[in-house]
Amino acid sequence: MSSPSPALSHLDESGQIRMVDVGAKSASDRIAIARGAVRMNALAYGLLTQPGQGKGEVLNTARVAAVLAAKRCAELIPLCHSLPLAFVGVDFSLDDATHTVEVRATCRTHYKTGVEMEAMTAASVAALTIYDMCKAADKGIVIEQIRLEYKAGGKSGEWRND
């Protein structure tokens, strides 16, 4: 694993923005996993998790939104490369004690650059979709802890957010 860079990769020598040139890099298998959490009040969480009510519809809608967002990441993040996604997976876990939905997004590719931004975008949009579908019951929903959890592949190798 390589050490952190002492410079920002999207700025040239004069401090101007630029897209990183990946033309000379070799394609390799890459994976990134991102997480986030959506915390809400007891009423909204109860409606979300009530059998026969919202859980399936809300979480399935959030899953589809996350996949679409990962596929459009380069349209949303100005200097992000468009890349061929081999896989996008989104999982949810429920924490009844804190009324929280945990989001986990995994992206894989075989390409010249990593899929961290796609995984982070997928986790973020899944969380935003849950917010959108539950906000009628709780305007104070909190989206938190959007973060890269794991990445592997490419020159920098494997990294974990411990």
Swiss-Prot record:
The active site is at residue 132. Belongs to the MoaC family. It is an enzyme of class 4 (lyase). Homohexamer; trimer of dimers. Substrate binds at residues 79-81, 117-118. It holds the Pfam family MoaC. Disulfide bonds: none annotated. One of its GO terms (biological process) is Mo-molybdopterin cofactor biosynthetic process. Pathway: Cofactor biosynthesis; molybdopterin biosynthesis. Signal peptide: none annotated. This is Cyclic pyranopterin monophosphate synthase. Catalyzes the conversion of (8S)-3',8-cyclo-7,8-dihydroguanosine 5'-triphosphate to cyclic pyranopterin monophosphate (cPMP). One of its GO terms (molecular function) is cyclic pyranopterin monophosphate synthase activity. It catalyses: (8S)-3',8-cyclo-7,8-dihydroguanosine 5'-triphosphate = cyclic pyranopterin phosphate + diphosphate. Its EC number is 4.6.1.17. Keywords: Lyase, Molybdenum cofactor biosynthesis.
